[in-house]
Amino acid sequence: MACRFPLHSSSPSQFLSPENRQRLPRNYPSISCQNNSATNVVHEDGDDNDKAKTNQVNLLAIPITLTIISASLAKPSFAAAKVTERKRTQKKPQEALTLEQLKAWSKDLPVVSNRIPYTDILSLKAEGKLKHVIKPPNLSLRQKAEPVLVVLEDSRVLRTVLPSLEGNKRFWEQWDELGIDVQCVNAYTPPVKRPPVPSPYLGFLWKVPAYMLTWVKPKKESKRAAELKRMREDFKRQRKEEIETMKEERVMMEKTMKAQKKQQERKKRKAVRKKKYEESLREARKNYRDMADMWARLAQDPNVATALGLVFFYIFYRVVVLNYRKQKKDYEDRLKIEKAEADERKKMRELEREMEGIEEEDEEVEEGTGEKNPYLQMAMQFMKSGARVRRASNKRLPEYLERGVDVKFTDVAGLGKIRLELEEIVKFFTHGEMYRRRGVKIPGGILLCGPPGVGKTLLAKAVAGEAGVNFFSISASQFVEIYVGVGASRVRALYQEARENAPSVVFIDELDAVGRERGLIKGSGGQERDATLNQLLVSLDGFEGRGEVITIASTNRPDILDPALVRPGRFDRKIFIPKPGLIGRMEILQVHARKKPMAEDLDYMAVASMTDGMVGAELANIVEIAAINMMRDGRTELTTDDLLQAAQIEERGMLDRKDRSLETWRQVAINEAAMAVVAVNFPDMKNIEFLTINPRAGRELGYVRVKMDHIKFKEGMLSRQSILDHITVQLAPRAADELWYGEDQLSTIWAETSDNARSAARSLVLGGLSDKHHGLNNFWVADRINDIDVEALRILNMCYERAKEILGRNRTLMDEVVEKLVQKKSLTKQEFFTLVELYGSSKPMPPSILELRKIKRLELEEMVLKLDMTTARNSS
C-alpha cells in the first residue's frame, strides 16, 4: 500500500549549493510516495468564481513525488583549501512542470510501501543505522500525527507515522536526547502548471473599449451581499488572528520547555560538580594524613637518615667537586684554543703579506712608523679581487701547502671525448714552447657550457691540477658591487695577481652574472655592470696568445652572454658538457665509490640504467645517501639495492609510509599498470625500467619509469605515430578505470595524464600532422579554432579506443601485474617482462626500415639467381 499524505511544494534550493541551483529541474536520486486519492481543498469563500478556481485546482491532484535531498554528501577535500566570498546573484524563478512532464519525471521512481513502528526510529538511531528522516515541508512535527519516510544507512527507505506530543510525550523526550532533529530534512515536490482555462464564448465582449463600458451603470449591491462580504472579511481576519495566536502559543510553549530542560540539566551538572568537589576534598584530606604519617615514620627511622646523608653527600660531590674539575679543564682548553687561534692569525698575516708582496723587513719598518689609517686599510681590502688562490704544488712554500690533494683527471669521470679537449689545454702549459715554435696560437679563454651539476667547476680544477699551475677561482657575482668602479678594479686586481703568479688558470664561475649583453639594464647599476664587462673584455684580450694565463669560465646560459665576450680571441674554445650517458654514469659511480665499502657483486650497470638523465652531482649524492642508509642499518657494505633505493630518493623524494586501504592500493596499481601494459606494445616506449605504487615526497600516486630515446623526446624529433602512441599511453589509466570499475564509478586519478593527452593532441593538430593539415598557415582564424578542437577530439577518441582494445586483449596480464604491485608495491624490469612473456598478448612490432631493406635485398638476390638459372638452362 502506498503512503498517502498531502505535501506542499518547497524550493529545493535550500538543500543545494549555489552552483547547482541553476540546474533544476533535474533527475536526482529520489523516492516516490504516491497518493491515490484526490485531496479536496475547501475554502470558506462563498464566491462562485473562487469555487470555480478551487475546482480547477483540485483537478491537479496527481501522484506526489518526493525527492530526497541528501544533506550528508561527502564534501571534496579540495573544497576546504580555499574559501572565497560568493557574489549574491538574483534568484531565478523556479520553472513549473506540466502534467505530462511531472508524470514522466516520476514514472520510474520506486514506491515506498514498507512500514515500521515509529518506536523503531529510536533503536535505529541508537544503533547508528539511521541516516535521514524525511518530513513534509512547511510543517512542524509534534503538533499532530504526521507520516514521514525513514532512510537507513544501507539506502533502504521505510515509512511510519509519528505521534503528536500529547499522544506520546516520552517518545519525544527520547527523540530530543538522541538529537534526531539534526537528521530531519524536508521533502520536495516540483510545482505544477495550472491547465489553461478555456475562454468563454462571449469573450469577444472583453475587447469592447473601456469608455463604452462607462455607459452601463453598475448594479447596486444589495444589503445581503454587502453583509455577506463584511462577514466573510471578519471571518478571514478572525481566522488569521487565531492562527497567529496559535503560532505564538506554540513558540512560547517550545521556549518554556527548552528553558525547563536547560534548568534541569543545569541542576544536574551542579549536583555532579558538587559531588566531585566533596570527593576531591575527602581524597585530599586522606592523602594529607597518609603523607604526614609517612614522614613521621621516616623521621624516626635511623636508616633513612643515613641514606639521605649519603644522597646529599653524592649531590655535593657531583655539584661542587666535579664541576670544579670540569671548569678547570675548560679553562685549560680555552687557553689552548686561544693559542692556536693566535698561531692561525699569524699564519694568515704571513699569507696576506706574501700575496701582497710585502717582505718581513718592510713590515718591521712599517711597525716603527705607526699604525696605518683604518679607513685606508678597509678601502685597500675592499678593492682586492677576492679570488681564492691555490698555489701549484711545486711553487708554494711548505708551510702554506693545502692538506687536500689536487684534483686530477682520474677524479673526473663520464667525460668521453671531452677529456681530449681538456688534455690539449694541459699540453699548452706543459709543452707550450712546442706549440709556439710551430706557430700554433695558444687559446686565451675556454668557455664551459652545460646543465647544472655536470662538473664544470671540477673540470677547471682538474685542468689546473694536471698542469701544475696556480689556480685562481672567483664567482662573477663578486665583481658587481654598489660602489662605482669596484667591479672593474677587482677584474684588474684579479688578472694582475694571475700575471704575477704565471703560469696560472683563472676560473670565473657563473659568467652570466656579469657577462650579460650590454645595454639591457638602464641606470647607474647597468653602467657599473657594463664597465665591469668592458674591463673583463680588455683583460681577456691582453693575455691572448701568450700562454701565461688562461681563463676558464662556466655558465648555464650561453645564449644571454654578450657577443663581444664569446667571440674568438677571448673565448677561443667553447666546450659543451652534456649529461653523462650510460657508460659515463657507471664511471662516475665507480669514482665516487672508490673510498666506500662496496659489495663485490655490486651491479653498477643496473644503477646506471636506473639513473637515466642524472648528472654527476646527483650521482655523487646517490652514493652518499646509500652510505648513510648503510650506517643507519648497521651494515658494513653497500649493495645494489642501497644504490637503487638512493636513486629513487634522489629522483622522487623520501618514501611516504602512511597507511592506505587495500582498495586505494589496488586503484593506484591499476592506474600505473595500465600505462606500463599499453606502453610495452609500442616500439618507442616498450623499455619499461621500473614500476612502483609507493607514494613519495607528498605525491599520492606511483610512477612508471620508461627509458626513451633522448634525441626523439627531448630534441623534438618525434614522428606522427610516436605522438599517437604517447597519447594512447596517457589515456590508458582512464580506459582502465572504465573497464575495471565501469562508467558510473570513474574517479579523477587519471586527470593529470588525460590533460597531458589533450595537450599532445592539440600540438599534433597545430603542428600540421593531422589528417586535415591544420597548422600549416593561418590556423588562428576564428572560424578554424573550433575545427582544430574537433580534430583534436577525434584524435583523442581514436587513441582512447585503441587503449581500450589493448587493455581488453591483455586483461590477464593487467590482473597479474596489479596483484604483484599490491603485494610487493614495486616491480623491476625483469619481473615485469617475465609477466609479459607469461600472460601478455601483444601484436608483432612493424618491421623497421633496415629490416624492410634486408627483405627486399633477399628477394632481389633470389630473383637474380632464378634468372641466371633460367638463362643457363636455355643456353644448354
Curated annotation (Swiss-Prot):
InterPro entries: AAA+_ATPase, AAA_lid_3, ATPase_AAA_core, P-loop_NTPase, Peptidase_M41, Peptidase_M41-like. It holds the Pfam family AAA. One of its GO terms (biological process) is protein import into chloroplast stroma. Residues 258-275 have a biased composition (Basic residues). GO terms for cellular component: chloroplast; chloroplast envelope; chloroplast membrane; Ycf2/FtsHi complex. Keywords: ATP-binding, Chloroplast, Hydrolase, Membrane, Nucleotide-binding, Plastid, Protease, Transit peptide, Transmembrane, Transmembrane helix. In the N-terminal section; belongs to the AAA ATPase family. In the C-terminal section; belongs to the peptidase M41 family. This is Probable inactive ATP-dependent zinc metalloprotease FTSHI 2, chloroplastic. It comes from Arabidopsis thaliana (Mouse-ear cress).
